[in-house]
């Protein structure tokens, strides 16, 4: 029956005159499905999920890779005040904002990038808005995807496997990754802990930036 309705609808409405109408339906349907609701963590569903997941865990250990100015960190503490958060933010301007925004003795911040190997890399951001939420290790995210001029910062990058061993962190309750296209490399750098099943949950961003880094969901499937 439903297929029959689709066929009839196509006969009547699959016309040039209805293109704008169907584009409108498409975009509001995406929002209804929870896609592209990035205006705040409530609309995105992140806030509700954090509350459900963290509320019954005693003293959860949370790793925030790509902490930006601390919005996610605040949501974590709202979900469970006993959380201990390790937050990584490589951009020097954004890192200062992060520390100014949140004062909590259960938060440790690090002005570091995270990837699949230790070293130094260039972090790119908007020439006219340095310190944005779109800073990326991929210059094309700024120049091609967003069509803007880019400025760069040399940043130190670490592997999480090394960091966890140095800080004697045995189990991670939640690993959050939002690195504007570098999410897969972050996971490659924590392969030991993933293999040993020491990370209970992973929350990562996947969007158009992954076109630039040439990563698909199939890559993440190995984990």
Locate each region found by the language model.
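Phosphate/nucleotide-binding beta-alpha loop and adjacent structural elements of enzyme active sites
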Residues: 1-223
């Amino acid at each position: 029956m439903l297929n029959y309705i689709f066929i009839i609808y196509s006969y009547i409405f699959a016309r040039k005159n209805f293109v704008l109408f169907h584009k409108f339906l498409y975009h509001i349907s995406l929002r209804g499905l929870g896609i592209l609701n990035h205006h705040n963590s409530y609309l995105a569903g992140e806030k509700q999920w954090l509350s459900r997941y963290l509320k019954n865990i005693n003293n959860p250990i949370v790793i925030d890779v790509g902490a930006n100015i601390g919005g996610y960190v605040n949501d974590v503490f709202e979900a469970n005040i006993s959380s201990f958060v390790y937050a990584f933010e490589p951009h020097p301007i954004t890192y200062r904002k992060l520390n100014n925004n949140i004062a909590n003795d259960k938060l440790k911040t690090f002005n570091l990038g995270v990837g699949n190997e230790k070293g130094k890399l260039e972090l790119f951001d908007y020439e006219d808005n340095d310190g944005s939420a779109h800073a990326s290790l991929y210059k094309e995210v700024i120049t091609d995807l967003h069509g803007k001029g880019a400025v760069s910062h040399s940043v130190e990058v670490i592997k999480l496997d090394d960091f966890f061993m140095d800080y004697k962190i045995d189990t991670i309750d939640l690993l959050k990754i939002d690195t504007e296209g570098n999410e897969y490399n972050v996971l490659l750098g924590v392969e030991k802990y993933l293999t040993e099943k020491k990370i209970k949950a992973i929350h990562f961003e996947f969007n158009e930036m992954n076109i630039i880094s040439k990563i698909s969901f199939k890559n993440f499937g190995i984990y």
